[in-house]
Design a protein with these regions (language model features):
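Conserved SAM/SAH cofactor-binding pocket of Class I
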Residues: 40-117
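Class I SAM-dependent transferase core
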Residues: 2-44
Length: 117
């Protein structure tokens, strides 16, 4: 899948079902806390998962790779992070199962529009 990678970004192998993640070379990069958080989630295949304040989407991708839920939605307030996370979904050819939405988790109407999780 052809995906645009910016000069200040890298593609990192998540070592999980071939999944890859686009991240900035400088600034926030995921660490062990995201790996642990996704490990302790109790997700089943039939579940819809929401990842609040998703950032790069790392927890969303790890939960998708580990548990294969029916759908994952990542919510993030920063447009640049949403765009990067959606490019990662495209890179992994999983845009039919995982999507990232720009929004504020304090926006009740937005949360209601996303449905039940």
């Amino acid at each position: 899948m052809e995906v645009n990678i910016e000069k200040d970004e890298s593609i990192d192998d998540l070592q999980l079902n071939g999944l890859q993640l686009i991240q900035k070379n400088e600034g926030f990069r995921f660490g062990v806390d995201a790996v642990l958080l996704s490990h302790f989630a109790n997700v089943k295949k039939k579940h819809r998962v929401i990842d609040l304040c998703t950032g790069t989407g790392i927890v969303s991708f790890l939960m998708y790779g580990k548990y294969n839920p029916s759908e994952v939605v990542g919510l993030e307030i920063q447009e640049e992070m949403v765009e990067m996370a959606n490019r990662s979904a495209k890179l992994n050819d999983i845009t039919d199962r995982i999507e990232f939405v720009k929004g504020d988790l304090k926006d009740k109407k937005l949360l209601d529009s996303l449905g039940r999780f």
